[in-house]
A protein has these predicted regions:
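A phosphate-binding catalytic loop at a beta-strand-loop-alpha-helix junction
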Residues: 50-72
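A compact, surface-exposed functional segment
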Residues: 70-75, 107-109
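Charged phosphate-binding loop/patch that engages nucleotide di/tri-phosphates or the phosphate backbone
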Residues: 95-111
């Protein structure tokens, strides 16, 4: 069982602590600042050793976008992060060009 879940789909009903990003299918987060904060928080949890689950409805576009953002937080360049996510997670992760551009522009405040 995960220690924490970050979901871009409100249909999930986990029994563990979780956060939800309002993010329409094939679209972008409705609140970029909130999405960025939640992605950074989930990354920090994973980095500290917690088991973090990331998900959406199908597990491709939104989930892939979140994973690619976490790869960026790990120090990989945005374009390389998209490629890495498709190679290591799912070849069709990040559904749309709009989502690709969002990931490429992912830039949380320096910590």
């Amino acid at each position: 069982m995960p220690d924490f879940g970050l979901y871009a789909y409100d249909g999930w009903r986990p029994t563990w602590p979780a956060a939800f990003i309002e993010w329409p299918d094939f679209g972008l987060p409705t609140d970029t600042d909130q999405a960025t904060r939640l992605i950074v928080d989930a990354f920090d949890r994973a980095k500290s050793g917690q088991l973090v689950e990331v998900g959406c409805h199908a597990g491709n576009g939104r989930t892939g976008s979140i994973i690619a953002c976490m790869v960026i937080l790990a120090g990989i360049a945005p374009t390389d992060a998209i490629e890495w996510t498709r190679e290591h997670y799912c070849w069709h992760a990040i559904d749309t060009k709009e989502q690709e551009r969002w990931v490429e522009g992912f830039a949380p405040e320096p910590r």
